[in-house]
Each structure stands twice: as structure tokens, then as C-alpha cells.
Amino acid sequence: MKLNISFPATGCQKLIEVDDERNVRTFYEKRMATEVAADSLGEEWKGYVVRISGGNDKQGFPMKQGVLTHGRVRLLLSKGHSCYRPRRTGERKRKSVRGCIVDANLSVLNLVIVKKGEKDIPGLTDTTVPRRLGPKRASRIRKLFNLSKEDDVRQYVVRKPLNKEGKKPRTKAPKIQRLVTPRVLQHKRRRIALKKQRTQKNKEEAADYAKLLAKRMKEAKEKRQEQIAKRRRLSSLRASTSKSESSQK
């Protein structure tokens, strides 16, 4: 079995092959996200504690958190699930994944060091890989350098050096996202003002429409009353003429 061990503090990662099955037997029957002492891996691993973060079986199927079995299952996966990347919007697919319990059928087991031991592991804890890119979001730059809201974030951006042969060295800085500038505040004020204007205009239009509707309803009511009165006059006139004719006979 191979062990893919990473140490987030230094940014290093190392793949080691374990020939003796007895050394990795401590990881058997353990679930993903379980913290295990790594003393059984060798003398140099004394005091180290690792967390099981995943793995792949001999056919390459990945372990999935929450699937409480040793074997393989076929699950209907969609966007947001691990072990699946949708190619189309709303696409779902039935994929084979391995359970989250470790056993001897794994080819690679992924481990993360959560506690460093007494000795250094060459290529893992003794060297540091610098991060290629710094934070881009304004709030994360503030968090990294412990800045207050009053401090100017633009002065603390991590710049990337671009050194080319025959050209003078220059640096490149990322565009800071979510940076609050006077222009952003002006845009926000304009948005709020436009929203207020729209609501005021909608209120005025609604009031005008209600007034016009009331006027039209009043006109229709008066017209209806006139028609009713006209019908009554005609019916009374007919009744009086028929009465006079009958009296003459």
C-alpha cells in the first residue's frame, strides 16, 4: 500500500510505499477523518498523529465520506457532491465510489499530519514550499496581516516577481476583490438613490392609476344609473299610454 502524506504547515507532500502490511494495519477498520497515531510506520514517525483524508482502491475508485461500507457502491451524484464533476448544468450521474472505511484493498491512502512528532521527516517537515500566490480578497489580506478597517490594504498585497533574462526585474500584483473605495461607495449611493426614485415613481403611478380607475368607475356608475332611469321612464310611459287606450275603449 502507498501512503500519500501531506503536511499543511510546510505545504509539502510525500508518497511513501509500505511493503509490510503489519505497519499499516493500525489504519484498518478506521473511517475517514479519524485521527490515528503513526508510530507503527517506523521509528522516525514516533509522536506523529495523522488524519485519514481519503484514498483510492486498486481499480482507482475514490473513497467517499459518509458511505459506511468497505466495498464499492454506485451512487447517483449531482453538483456539490464529492467524487463527481458535472459537465452540464443540472446533470446527475450514477458513479462507483468506495466506502469510507479503510481496508487492505486500497492502493493509496491519503493522510494529513495534524501533530508533528519528535523527529523531522526528510522532504516533508524539514523543507517549506512557499505559497505561489497570496490572498486576493481584501478581507483575507486583512486577516493575514492583522490589519484594521482603517489600514490601506493595497500596500500589503503579496506581489509575484517576474524575472526574465535580459529584462529588468518587475513584479505583478493581483486585482484586489471586494475592496471598498470611494468609487464603490459612490456606486452604492447611486444604486440606493435610483432604487428610491423607482419606488417613488411606482407609488405616484399607482396613485394616478387608482385615481383614474375611481373616475372611470364613477362615470360608468352614473351612465348605468342614467340608463336605468331612462328605462323606468319609458316603461312608465308605455304603461300610461296603454291605460289611456283601454279607458277610451
UniProtKB/Swiss-Prot annotation:
Compositionally skewed regions (Basic and acidic residues) per UniProt: 216-229
Skewed-composition ranges (Low complexity): 236-249
Biological process annotations from GO: cytoplasmic translation; glucose homeostasis; positive regulation of cell population proliferation; ribosomal small subunit biogenesis
Disordered as annotated region, ranges: 216-249
Subcellular locations according to the entry: Cytoplasm; Nucleus, Nucleolus
A GO term from the CC aspect: nucleus
Post-translational changes noted in the entry: Ribosomal protein S6 is the major substrate of protein kinases in eukaryote ribosomes. The phosphorylation is stimulated by growth factors, tumor promoting agents, and mitogens. It is dephosphorylated at growth arrest.
One Gene Ontology molecular-function label: structural constituent of ribosome
Modified residues (Phosphoserine): S235, S236, S240, S244, S247
UniProt entry keywords in alphabetical sequence: Cytoplasm, Nucleus, Phosphoprotein, Ribonucleoprotein, Ribosomal protein
Pfam families referenced in this protein's UniProt entry, alphabetically: Ribosomal_S6e (PF01092)
Membership in a protein family: Belongs to the eukaryotic ribosomal protein eS6 family.
Role according to the record: Component of the 40S small ribosomal subunit. Plays an important role in controlling cell growth and proliferation through the selective translation of particular classes of mRNA. Part of the small subunit (SSU) processome, first precursor of the small eukaryotic ribosomal subunit.
Subunit and interaction comment: Component of the small ribosomal subunit. Part of the small subunit (SSU) processome, composed of more than 70 proteins and the RNA chaperone small nucleolar RNA (snoRNA) U3.
Name of the featured protein: Small ribosomal subunit protein eS6
